Amino acid sequence: MALPVPWPVILCAWALALPAAPSLAAAPDAVAVLVTYHSLSGNTEKMARAVAEGAQSVPGTLVALKRVGDVTGNDLFSSDALIVGSPVYWSNMSGEVKTFFDNWQLKFGVFPEFKMRNKVGAAFATGGQASGGKEVTMLTILAAMLGNQMIVVSGGGAFGASATTEGDSPGIDDKELAAARDLGRRVAEVAVLIKRGARK
């Protein structure tokens, strides 16, 4: 399994290489999109990479792809948009993703300033069964974002992008990857609009 690409190696094709740590001051016009996920089987990681591809397709974006356990406070607070993916565990987000959200305060101190306020947020999920809890999982992710006063958007589906990994279509199929790319693109487009508006 390939290791996740560190911030900010994934860039739009036209963008210049930036330092190892993100520097939005050095690239004030860039919109930073963080795609983060938990994956054991590789299915959610595959979706995450497609989400990142979609975000990367929007001109003016700087995209990072990281596992939730590798995200730092700097990654989180330097981003303009955050897209979180999880496998379905008992019709909910995985424990690793829940810990990631808990760490926003326990490790990174988002309160009382609401440091994630007005950042764009979105969710994606993978699950074995067609009705095994993917929408519920995405809604729990979005609820955590709303609790932090983020601006949540959809794309690829009503609540985000999802994939059914068992049955007639094991793994991730092309339609599900296309939905993941749509989600990434939608989030990046909204983040660009918001950042442009904030400068006016």
For each predicted feature, which ranges?
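Bacterial N-terminal signal peptides
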Residues: P4-A20
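Boundary at the C-terminal end of the N-terminal hydrophobic targeting segment
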Residues: A20-A26
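N-terminal beta1-alpha1 ligand-phosphate binding loop
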Residues: V31-A55
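Short helix-loop-beta junction
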Residues: A48-T61, L146-G147, I151
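A short beta-strand-loop structural module common to alpha/beta enzyme folds
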Residues: G60-D70
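Helix-loop-strand module that forms the ligand-binding subsite of alpha/beta enzymes
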Residues: G69-G155
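Glycine-rich phosphate/pyrophosphate-binding loop and the adjoining helix
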Residues: V153-K200
